[in-house]
């Protein structure tokens, strides 16, 4: 059963619409659906709400520590409420999936994602759930003929807003993720994964 849903992103209005904030977009939607208000909670270093989602009590969190310090926020809340790693779902942007793709998985490495790296370090575990929201990779925007030897600027890419057509399919992917949330919060994660990956 998932007790804590974390969305990753960077704080500040200048980052709101950037690809790296896809996790925040999901949490904002969940909070709206639950009629919950995210409030600045200093002891958790983030915006926090306790929500009633699909009959279950769930903690929603948007760390306000900047991406590479996300673990500080997650571990503060997890320790306070005695939440285990496998009861945590972290929603994050995923370079290795094209826009419009969304996948669930338990555990694994960070894939170069600094937010995940910091969470794993603070929890001393990689055994938490991830909701991977595809944003694509900057190399995909380079014509194939020019890709050899090209060094795409990943840092610049994730800190820019998606193109309009990308935003539309990312929003649709987040809607599909929201559709399986009743199963997720009830602990039916295998079923949620199968349904999400079928789309």
UniProtKB/Swiss-Prot annotation:
The record marks 10 as: Discriminates between blocked and unblocked aminoacyl-tRNA. SUPFAM superfamilies: Peptidyl-tRNA hydrolase-like. InterPro entries: Pept_tRNA_hydro (IPR001328), Pept_tRNA_hydro_CS (IPR018171), Pept_tRNA_hydro_sf (IPR036416). Its EC number is 3.1.1.29. It catalyses: an N-acyl-L-alpha-aminoacyl-tRNA + H2O = an N-acyl-L-amino acid + a tRNA + H(+). GO terms for cellular component: cytoplasm. The record marks 93 as: Stabilizes the basic form of H active site to accept a proton. Disulfide bonds: none annotated. Transmembrane segments: none annotated. It comes from the Bacteria. It is found in: Cytoplasm. GO terms for molecular function: peptidyl-tRNA hydrolase activity; tRNA binding. NCBIfam families: pth (TIGR00447). Monomer. Hydrolyzes ribosome-free peptidyl-tRNAs (with 1 or more amino acids incorporated), which drop off the ribosome during protein synthesis, or as a result of ribosome stalling. Catalyzes the release of premature peptidyl moieties from peptidyl-tRNA molecules trapped in stalled 50S ribosomal subunits, and thus maintains levels of free tRNAs and 50S ribosomes. Belongs to the PTH family. This is Peptidyl-tRNA hydrolase. It comes from Burkholderia multivorans (strain ATCC 17616 / 249).
